[in-house]
Swiss-Prot record:
Substrate binds at F2, L3, F8, R36, I37, N38, R51, R64, Y102. Pathway: Bacterial outer membrane biogenesis; LPS O-antigen biosynthesis. Coiled coil: none annotated. Homodimer. Residues 13-152 form the Nudix hydrolase domain. Mg(2+) binds at G49, E69, Q122. This is GDP-mannose mannosyl hydrolase WbdQ/WbhG. Belongs to the Nudix hydrolase family. It comes from Escherichia coli O157:H7. It catalyses: GDP-alpha-D-mannose + H2O = D-mannose + GDP + H(+). The lineage of its organism: Bacteria, Pseudomonadati, Pseudomonadota, Gammaproteobacteria, Enterobacterales. It is an enzyme of class 3 (hydrolase). Its EC number is 3.6.1.-. SUPFAM superfamilies: Nudix (SSF55811).
Length: 169
């Protein structure tokens, strides 16, 4: 269910949003990043993903988001659970008047780049970066770098050894 902008603004101002991030890895271990057009994280490199809609099952959200963000509809079984994360932004999709708080369910997808049909609706450019490069690149948003940096405390329900284990897989 998509909401009118005023209703959505009230929700973003008042409560966390639930989203799915798609950590897409190619055969060389590089991660797909898109340069964000929209707020929050506008102008930063970030993994694809998006919100879970009201009354939408996670499986359906995953399929919808892979189609919208990667250009190919994929079942949830393609993704490997990569933890639950918390993302905080000082702005929101409508402007800078209030912050945005996401609870993010992340999935790792190992895909061949040639099957992707990357759209330009959310990102104006794409690149593949190694984990080592993206961790040290300030143009990659902090919340995205956190997926590969075991020193952050942004994973919920995972301790550092679990994050390290996920990063090596």
């Amino acid at each position: 269910m998509f909401l009118h902008s005023q209703d959505f603004a009230t929700i973003v101002r008042s409560t966390p949003l639930i989203s799915i991030d798609l950590i897409v890895e190619n055969e060389f271990g590089e991660i797909l990043l898109g340069k964000r057009i929209n707020r929050p994280a506008q102008g930063y490199w970030f993994v694809p993903g998006g919100r879970v809609l009201k009354d939408e099952k996670l499986q359906t959200a995953f399929e919808r988001l892979t189609e919208i963000e990667l250009g190919i509809r994929l079942p949830l079984s393609v993704g490997k659970f990569y933890g639950i994360w918390q993302h905080f932004y000082e702005d929101n999709s409508m402007g800078g008047d209030f912050s945005t708080h996401y609870i993010v369910i992340a999935f790792l997808l190992k895909l061949q780049p040639n099957i992707l049909k990357l759209p330009k609706s959310q990102h104006n450019a794409y690149c593949w970066l190694s984990r080592a490069k993206l961790i040290n690149d300030d143009d990659v948003h902090y919340n995205c770098r956190a997926y590969f940096n075991n020193k952050t405390n942004d994973a919920i329900g995972l301790d550092n050894k679990d994050i390290i284990c996920l990063m090596r897989q």
